[in-house]
Amino acid sequence: GLFIIDKEGVIQHSTINNEGVIQHSTINNLAIGRFGVLLADQGLALRSIPNGPSAL
């Protein structure tokens, strides 16, 4: 799916759940949500982990 993440690390929209709201943390630039973990860098989703939070 497509994630649009702003420079503050907030996921603005997700085409996976169409809710546009996922729990996030700007610490370590991690966006953690229901569908796994995204590693964000300068507003870009570089990596997604489909099976939930895990050690990076």
Curated annotation (Swiss-Prot):
Annotated GO CC locations: chloroplast
UniProt EC number: 1.11.1.24
UniProt keyword terms in alphabetical order: Antioxidant, Chloroplast, Disulfide bond, Oxidoreductase, Peroxidase, Plastid, Redox-active center
Subcellular location: Plastid, Chloroplast
GO molecular function, one term: thioredoxin-dependent peroxiredoxin activity
Covalent S-S links between cysteines: none
Catalytic activity: a hydroperoxide + [thioredoxin]-dithiol = an alcohol + [thioredoxin]-disulfide + H2O
Protein family (similarity comment): Belongs to the peroxiredoxin family. AhpC/Prx1 subfamily.
Stated role: Thiol-specific peroxidase that catalyzes the reduction of hydrogen peroxide and organic hydroperoxides to water and alcohols, respectively. Plays a role in cell protection against oxidative stress by detoxifying peroxides. May be an antioxidant enzyme particularly in the developing shoot and photosynthesizing leaf.
Note: On the 2D-gel the determined pI of this protein is: 5.7, its MW is: 22.8 kDa.
Subunit structure and binding partners: Homodimer; disulfide-linked, upon oxidation.
Stated name of the protein: Putative 2-Cys peroxiredoxin BAS1
Annotated organism of origin: Pinus strobus
